[in-house]
């Protein structure tokens, strides 16, 4: 009976030892990971796209995480999940997973911007920077009522990035807009670009550099004549006629207007 118990103990011991020996140690695991090739990852990501997003979220710097861009740069060429950075040294698309600026940034959605457009008659002073850009040109104001995209893009940018200045103009009997970023160093969050693209069907939206400023230009190519979106343009024009434009703003408008002639 004693011998039998001893054999059982030895048998269990050998079984446990065998299982332990089969488990790869840390060095073996590391060796296994190092054997993964780029084409292996590509195969996995093709089969399981959700893994690619998890992989990009985990790694801190995928390769360099950056790609140079040329200006003028159309937002139609923007890669998903990338931010845009402009500086005197480089203009780049930066992978969102490698971005260090966007964690605390809140960006309005296209729906938020549409609600703000519908309420603009009641919020003239709140949106006065936008209306300064019209220079009390009532014909441009009338055009804006039929092109909610112009206000939406301004609203999204203005609520994401400080120190901007809009200038409205007429092109081919449609309203266009320049947004002047009053700095040569600029970071545009990925989500901001995504929301601009979401509202800009029928528009050409691109970024360029003029002197020491980055310029976002919005050009209407196809006007949607079937829109059911309406605002009280008469009331809006009346409020804007009564609104004073500060001398500092008027001087800035004239300065930028002179620089931007022929820019679009």
From Swiss-Prot:
Function: Plays an essential role in virion nuclear egress, the first step of virion release from infected cell. Within the host nucleus, NEC1 interacts with the newly formed capsid through the vertexes and directs it to the inner nuclear membrane by associating with NEC2. Induces the budding of the capsid at the inner nuclear membrane as well as its envelopment into the perinuclear space.
Zinc finger extent (CCCH-type): 83-187
Swiss-Prot/TrEMBL keywords: Host membrane, Host nucleus, Membrane, Metal-binding, Phosphoprotein, Zinc, Zinc-finger
Biased composition (Basic residues): 1-12
Pfam families reported in the protein's UniProt record: Herpes_UL31 (PF02718)
Protein name (record): Nuclear egress protein 1
Originating organism: Human herpesvirus 6A (strain Uganda-1102) (HHV-6 variant A)
Family membership: Belongs to the herpesviridae NEC1 protein family.
GO cellular component, one term: host cell nuclear inner membrane
Entry keyword Zinc-finger: yes
Any one GO molecular-function label of the UniProt entry: zinc ion binding
Coiled coil start-end: none
GO aspect biological process, one term: viral budding from nuclear membrane
Main location: host cell
Description of how the protein assembles with itself and partners: Forms a heterohexameric complex with NEC2. Interacts with capsid vertex specific component 2/CVC2; this interaction directs the capsid to the host inner nuclear membrane to initiate budding.
Gene coding for it: NEC1
Disordered: annotated segments: 1-22
Post-translational modification: Phosphorylated at serine residues in the N-terminus. This phosphorylation regulates the localization within the inner nuclear membrane.
Keyword Zinc-finger listed: yes
Cellular compartment(s): Host nucleus inner membrane
């Amino acid at each position: 009976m004693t011998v039998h118990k001893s054999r059982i103990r030895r048998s269990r011991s050998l079984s446990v030892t065998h299982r332990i020996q089969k488990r790869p140690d840390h060095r073996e695991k590391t060796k296994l990971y190092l054997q993964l090739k780029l084409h292996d990852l590509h195969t996995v990501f093709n089969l399981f796209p959700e893994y690619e997003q998890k992989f990009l979220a985990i790694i801190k710097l995928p390769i360099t995480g950056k790609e140079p861009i040329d200006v003028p740069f159309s937002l139609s060429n923007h890669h998903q999940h990338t931010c845009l950075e402009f500086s005197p040294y480089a203009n780049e698309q930066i992978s969102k997973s490698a971005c260090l600026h966007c964690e605390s940034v809140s960006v309005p959605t296209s729906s938020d911007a549409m609600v703000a457009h519908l309420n603009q008659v009641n919020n003239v002073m709140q949106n006065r920077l936008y209306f300064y850009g019209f220079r009390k040109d009532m014909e441009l104001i009338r055009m804006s009522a039929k092109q909610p995209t112009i206000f939406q893009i301004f609203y999204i940018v203005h609520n994401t990035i400080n120190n901007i200045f809009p200038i409205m103009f007429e092109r081919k009997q449609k309203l266009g807009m320049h947004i002047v970023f009053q700095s040569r160093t600029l970071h545009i969050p990925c989500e901001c670009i995504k929301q601009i693209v979401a509202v800009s069907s029928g528009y050409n939206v691109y970024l360029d550099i003029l002197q020491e400023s980055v310029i976002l230009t919005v050009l209407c190519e196809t006007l949607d004549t079937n829109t059911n979106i309406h605002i009280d343009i008469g009331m809006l024009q009346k409020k804007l006629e009564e609104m004073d434009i500060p001398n500092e703003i008027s001087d800035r408008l004239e300065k930028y207007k002179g620089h931007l002639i022929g820019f679009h």
